[in-house]
Amino acid sequence: SVRLVKGSHIVTRRLFEHDHAYIFQNPDKRIIFAIPYEHDYTLIGTTDIEYRGDPAQVAITADETQYLCDSINRYFRQKISPADVRWTYSGVRPLLEEEGADNPSAVTRDYSLELDAPAGEAPLLSVFGG
């Protein structure tokens, strides 16, 4: 079966002058990145939260915003708060359900292919996971 996992991102003022990206590992073992974005901004992400709502209505939560700010503040001298967030975006991705994987971050990023090819009809290839 498929499990929906939400990833959210924040965009803040530019936090560093060069064009290199950073990748950090948090104490909870999650990876966070900070990437130069559109010359004047820094793109920070991502969260990894199980999602049970309508994928068309996905949005970042206050807790996710704070998590990303706290994550960056652990590593950068220039501190940020939710008030520094210029905009956000979120998305939902389907991951393969894994027995015993309660934490969305622990779910495999592997994929599965299913081919439905009834005789005399066009085949349908479905890709799950990622």
Regions from the PLM with identified roles:
Residues 1-44, 49-130:
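C-terminal catalytic lobe of FAD-dependent flavoproteins
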